Amino acid sequence: MANIVSNEKTYRHTQKVRKENHAKMSKLRTIVKKTRSSNEQAQLNEAYKVIDTTASKGVIHKNKANRLKSRTAKAFKTNLEVTA
């Protein structure tokens, strides 16, 4: 643990941000998994929203967000064709 007050504050802040980012990533992974096996357009729109929000907050890189949206849409489309 840090001996300097400012370092202690930085440590507390880092831990808080880490927990928040972990929660955002968990939500992202969950919604992507549900969307890939879903056949509802609203679910895909919600996934896009969560992916964009996560990228804008800096949790994931914007290129990763675009790649994730593309792959999710492809899996969604494949699942839609199989169930139809």
Swiss-Prot record:
According to its UniProt record, what is one Pfam family this protein matches? Ribosomal_S20p
The highest taxon in the source lineage is Bacteria
What would you give as a GO molecular function for this chain, any one? structural constituent of ribosome
| Annotated Gene Ontology cellular component terms | cytosol; small ribosomal subunit
Query: InterPro entries of this UniProt entry?
Result: Ribosomal_bS20 (IPR002583), Ribosomal_bS20_sf (IPR036510)
* Keyword presence, Isomerase: no
The alphabetized UniProt keywords are: Ribonucleoprotein, Ribosomal protein, RNA-binding, rRNA-binding
Q: Name one GO biological process term.
A: translation
Which residue stretches belong to region Disordered?
Answer: 1-25
UniProt record similarity statement: Belongs to the bacterial ribosomal protein bS20 family.
UniProt-listed NCBIfam families: S20 (TIGR00029)
Describe its function.
Binds directly to 16S ribosomal RNA.
Q: What is this protein called?
A: Small ribosomal subunit protein bS20
From what organism does this protein derive? Ureaplasma parvum serovar 3 (strain ATCC 700970)
